Amino acid sequence: MWRLRTGPKAGEDTHLFTTNNYAGRQIWEFDANAGSPQEIAEVEDARHKFSDNTSRFKTTADLLWRMQFLREKKFEQKIPRVIIEDARKIKYEDAKTALKRGLLYFTALQADDGHWPAENSGPNFYTPPFLICLYITGHLEKIFTPEHVKELLRHIYNMQNEDGGWGLHVESHSVMFCTVINYVCLRIVGEEVGHDDQRNGCAKAHKWIMDHGGATYTPLIGKALLSVLGVYDWSGCNPIPPEFWLLPSSFPVNGGTLWIYLRDTFMGLSYLYGKKFVAPPTPLILQLREELYPEPYAKINWTQTRNRCGKEDLYYPRSFLQDLFWKSVHMFSESILDRWPLNKLIRQRALQSTMALIHYHDESTRYITGGCLPKAFHMLACWIEDPKSDYFKKHLARVREYIWIGEDGLKIQSFGSQLWDTALSLHALLDGIDDHDVDDEIKTTLVKGYDYLKKSQITENPRGDHFKMFRHKTKGGWTFSDQDQGWPVSDCTAESLECCLFFESMPSELIGKKMDVEKLYDAVDYLLYLQSDNGGIAAWQPVEGKAWLEWLSPVEFLEDTIVEYEYVECTGSAIAALTQFNKQFPGYKNVEVKRFITKAAKYIEDMQTVDGSWYGNWGVCFIYGTFFAVRGLVAAGKTYSNCEAIRKAVRFLLDTQNPEGGWGESFLSCPSKKYTPLKGNSTNVVQTAQALMVLIMGDQMERDPLPVHRAAQVLINSQLDNGDFPQQEIMGTFMRTVMLHFPTYRNTFSLWALTHYTHALRRLLP
């Protein structure tokens, strides 16, 4: 039976090193002797129910670890469920009861080190690079036991679409990129193609690939991955020259101007490209060469395949001039830089510089790196440099942290959302303190959560000349996951800072030792550092590159991947945190903080769309963006009566509320950049919760409370017997087209909304 281990309990390794005793670390382990027959039956039932329901939802409820934690803590929901028959007759006690039972359930899910574990996956291109890398290096069977493979197959087949392909993410239509690399995964772990039998998933995938022209229609990243494996030719790839990292900072585009995730990914890819590394052929590789293409492998004209991309994959098409540009770069890098004597004078120097960057970034993130995609490429690059090196062994030691097990099977996830989920969870608890007694259970949860925040803040900048190595200031920030990962994010920092400020205002006898005030100042300095001239705030680093550089993007299935941008959600979170900070510490950088808030509020107002919403860059989509935008504006002192932007936002939500009283927005809003309701105008509890909070912040209760009551009725009636909320559609996103799964959102946002609602009802009490 699978068990989730967290923190120091997740196990030690001689090649691991940590900054805070592994706070937030998550590892899945299989114990053949664990679990009673009843527990095993419950897990199997969850698996069957998920597989039977994939035609409706492909997002897991993340039940396996939840079932484990609830058993270990002997959780029992003793508060009866509340059902609201008439939205106009909701009582304060009803809302408070629903909130209380939801909090009791959710507090039982907290890990010993204070964080809330959760899956953070969704893209179907996360797992294959890991498997291909481990296969090439000969470590696949050392990491993936038969039990791992069993769960891996379960997940791959659960995510397969009816037509035989795999989408870019779990709810997407089939695309060549993910279909090819998941097919390769199936073959690597021993699945046979068989015949074109509709019951044979591998055969269905093969047929989809052939019906859509073959693997030459894979986007660039897929082509590079196949080239490394030896089932595609590097000459069929657009260039990823390592010489790029030698460009001076005075050049319009250089390593420092790139979006941080693209930089980390292409750092490893450029090393592989510069080396033209190809795995030694195996019988399987030779078979794949013939299976992936409609024509014989030896007869493929690779030059003609370089700019191919399947229409199903293509989101960011290139113009003729862009194709001409990349052709020129290819001619220069291959005809000149890759030949004697420049291959010795420049190419070798570029490869050495690239590897130095890889090592620096790996060390700075304790070998977690910036995500599962760069992790696989960096790990392979280190193995190519020296298969016996400590660099490679340190990479292997961190692989298990990317593996996640759910009722849908095994998948590779992002580096984790531990900090982000914990900060949002604490908001729901802290905002509701006045509306529920701080009993021992809640108190313990708060103390542990605060302890996790204190342990997770980054306390120093990257070592050495970090600007030269394309790293920015990190001191004072919080990451998306844990301190070891080392990449601070603006909204994670803002939400964590605001929580710490709330804790700062509470008595020490309730929450224990408080955070050093200087560390609060460090967090403020980090947020101030990230603000752009337009008032917005970026996610990871100050905006440096120009938007026109997107013209150079080599990535066909994403948008806005070249440079960093400002984001409405990050800006709204920063305003909320800095406003609270200024109230509690008006003596620290008062002028700078107030200037930040004024400029940031103006930026948010400027970014509002015509219909009154805001585009959400990190969540689905206009409802998500509107929640964080309005929250920021209200924190800045804006109200429905004095701010047209808030009035327009309220009108947008009232116009999109469905007949049931809730809201439901499709992920299709993200790529189309147009509000798209869910099929059948159905409801999603996460978006209903976000919309409900916006209406309350927009003073809707004072004008016409019925829309708010109807939304609250949806949330309260959706609550399950144990206090959980139903898992529905995918809610996270990045770069327009890729969706991320945040299963904890159904709890955090629903509870947060019920907290707002109970506050609003209490104000109406006589």
From Swiss-Prot:
Q: Which residues form the signal peptide?
A: none
**CDD domains reported in the protein's UniProt record:** SQCY_1 (cd02892)
Do you know which InterPro entries this protein is assigned to?
Answer: SQ_cyclase_C (IPR032696), SQ_cyclase_N (IPR032697), Squalene_cyclase (IPR018333), Terpene_synthase_CS (IPR002365), Terpenoid_cyclase/PrenylTrfase (IPR008930)
> What tissue expression does the UniProt record report for this protein?
Expressed primarily in the root epidermis.
Keywords assigned by UniProt, alphabetized: Isomerase, Repeat
Keyword flag Repeat: yes
Q: What else is known?
A: Constitutes with three contiguous genes an operon-like gene cluster that is involved in the thalianol pathway.
From the Swiss-Prot or TrEMBL record, give the protein name: Thalianol synthase 1
Say which species the protein is native to: Arabidopsis thaliana
Q: Which gene encodes it?
A: THAS1
